[in-house]
Amino acid sequence: MQDIINPIDRALLKAELTKEKRLRSTNKSKNEIYIVTAHDSPNVMQEIGRLREVAFRYYGGGTGFPVDIDEYDTMEDAYRQLIVWSPEDEQILGGYRFLCGSDVKFDENGKPILATSHLFNFSEKFIKEILPYTVELGRSFVALEYQSTRSGAKGLFVLDNLWDGLGALSVVDPSLRYYFGKVTMYNTYNQEARNMILYFLGLHFPDADQLITPVYPLETNMDVEKMRSLFPHDNFKDNYKVCLLYTSPSPRDPKT
């Protein structure tokens, strides 16, 4: 496990966050949304990589390298980085990386070159009918010091600010209809809560057309009969309440 790099000098960050890279102001907390790449903002990219590694290591993940930056961040047609910037604190508060379907390249076998290509098989229907109108999202993070409500309104609204930015993408490009990406659940996550979330999503949002299937199917210790008893309702709203009840920060024990 290598040491994480020191924070990038704020003057270098501000020099790269120029007017043409600004997407919009946030609805709350008076922050700014910027879109950058590793090529046009190398110092910002280093700070993004540092913040990712800090946040992901804290929860049991991370790359183990000084920064979390991979080939998809740095390749010729690199993924773009959407970040929340605090003009007041002069800090990056959070971010996503993304690639619009219209910008996706394909390999010699016709397989889309995506950060998730090693995880998923994509059907022809998805590639032809869905992907061109889709934004692939990944590497989402909130800077560790802004993940607690103790950081005040800025911390409370960082996720809201990020969603402002994601929503703005479809305003800039009205052809975008879908958002797609993977969700990471670390081994440290409560397994019972994880199983409930997975069951709930499968119950109400099944992929009947098999648009995307996992290369390595997820194996769980899920007790399906128990899950059925925990989610007895035939509608989303009531089952969602059950899911929240058991998977909130201080969840009830489903065994009781």
Where are these regions (language model features)?
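Conserved N-terminal entry element of GNAT/NAT acetyltransferase domains
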Residues: Q2-H39
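Short amphipathic alpha-helix that is part of the acyltransferase structural core
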Residues: S25-D70, R80-C100
